[in-house]
């Protein structure tokens, strides 16, 4: 049996599959999630059920979204959990998470995310932030560093700003490659994201905030006045209180929101 086969299933590279098997890490993650019986909880990419089984044992019902139809079928036939699982065979990047949430029962989301889609998947989930109470994800350690970064460091980028706009970010634990089969070539980490009921800084238009961040970080080595020159003049940036000699990685989340709100007001007043 090669090192890509675990519990009779061969990991598929196109799905970014690395199966967690370390009991200590599994127990630590489940402890961090702390599932409760009545939770409205969903797992993305349950795989072979390393997290599915212990979480499902603590809740009334567990929603799972699995792209791999073989793994979805395997879970449906699980001798113990089959009746507890609400299984959707689908691409989480296209899935409407709003269908699973309600005002009374916001979603709790967790998963060992495929590293090849983790960033776009988080951006997709941010669209449902008002319907989610918390998220626990296993990610590439580099991505967790980006989520937690502050201004003035290399890890700080568009993902940082958007994640910290929507959520409080809490690192949980680091995970070595040996905890997986097959072992990835990178270190991993678990992170908790708690969407704010009300963000600390309110963007008038999320579309404008996304546009500003994209423009700034697409040219991150340029000063902010050059990176955003198609949107705002030096004088306008100075009017907002932005140091125009700074680069994208030196601008705080609050400052990005202020820039986006200024851009929005300009468009509204045209």
Swiss-Prot record:
EC number(s) from the headed UniProt entry: 2.1.1.182
InterPro entries membership: KsgA/Erm (IPR001737), rRNA_Ade_diMease-like_C (IPR023165), rRNA_Ade_Mease_Trfase_CS (IPR020596), rRNA_Ade_methylase_Trfase_N (IPR020598), rRNA_adenine_dimethylase (IPR011530), SAM-dependent_MTases_sf (IPR029063)
Record has Disulfide bond as a keyword: no
GO molecular function annotation: 16S rRNA (adenine(1518)-N(6)/adenine(1519)-N(6))-dimethyltransferase activity; RNA binding
Residues the entry annotates as binding S-adenosyl-L-methionine: 18, 20, 45, 66, 91, 112
Family indicated by similarity: Belongs to the class I-like SAM-binding methyltransferase superfamily. rRNA adenine N(6)-methyltransferase family. RsmA subfamily.
Subcellular location: Cytoplasm
Name assigned to this protein: Ribosomal RNA small subunit methyltransferase A
Domain of life: Bacteria
Top-level class of the enzyme under EC nomenclature: transferase
Gene that this polypeptide is encoded by: rsmA
